[in-house]
Amino acid sequence: YDIRIPVDMNCKTIEQKIATLVKEIAEKRGVEAFYSILDETEPFEAAHNSPLVRAFTLGIMEAEKSRPTLIRKTGTGDMNVLGNQWNIPVVTYGPGDPHEAHTIDEKVSIEEYLKGIEILKKTLQHLKRLHDKKMQ
């Protein structure tokens, strides 16, 4: 099974809950039960007021002429690993429908791809401006 851990919990808490449940069920049914954890990645969520999130929001607003909707991406990825390991804000961004990511229906049009490049350019400009402003 693939368990998605909410950001207000951690892997150790989930492991303890699993161990307790497995033990209770095994005792109740009079059987031995085993499980193994093959991999784990702590949950991560960047602060919505971080300069990186702000820069992306501004870049998208400038390119799309509308305010983006921030969504919580559950699961594992570079964002979880880098954000937790380095204690830095990290976002996942890309063109296309995020609900179709890694499915048979995943696709990106040329128009979306080019718009994504424009958004990244504008985001980097805003990130530099926000960084320079903070350094003053």
Annotate each predicted stretch with a short phrase.
Residues D2-Q136:
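Metal-dependent amide/peptide-bond hydrolase catalytic core
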